[in-house]
Amino acid sequence: MAANCDVCGKGPGFGNNISHSHRRTSRRWNPNIQRVRTVVSGTPKRVNACTSCIKAGKVSR
């Protein structure tokens, strides 16, 4: 599944896991993307939307 929001364009954030011995390994934080059925220009369509866009009402379900 794509880790990008079709509404706001939010994508993954990158950083490091840091262990107790302070070794670093790269990792990524994916946004919480949900596949939502919404109406886009009069036709129902499925879009990938992050939960912050769904909560903010930017996606009409």
UniProtKB/Swiss-Prot annotation:
Gene3D superfamilies assigned: Ribosomal protein L28/L24 (2.30.170.40)
InterPro entries from the UniProt entry: Bacterial_rp_bL28 (IPR050096), Ribosomal_bL28 (IPR026569), Ribosomal_bL28/bL31-like_sf (IPR034704), Ribosomal_bL28_bact-type (IPR001383), Ribosomal_bL28_sf (IPR037147)
Lineage: superkingdom: Bacteria
GO MF term list: structural constituent of ribosome
Intrachain S-S bonds: none
Xref: SUPFAM superfamilies: L28p-like (SSF143800)
Keywords annotated in UniProt: Ribonucleoprotein, Ribosomal protein
A GO biological process held by the record: translation
GO cellular component: ribonucleoprotein complex; ribosome
Membrane-traversing stretches: none
Family statement: Belongs to the bacterial ribosomal protein bL28 family.
Protein name: Large ribosomal subunit protein bL28A
Organism the protein comes from: Streptomyces coelicolor (strain ATCC BAA-471 / A3(2) / M145)
Encoding gene, per UniProt annotation: rpmB1
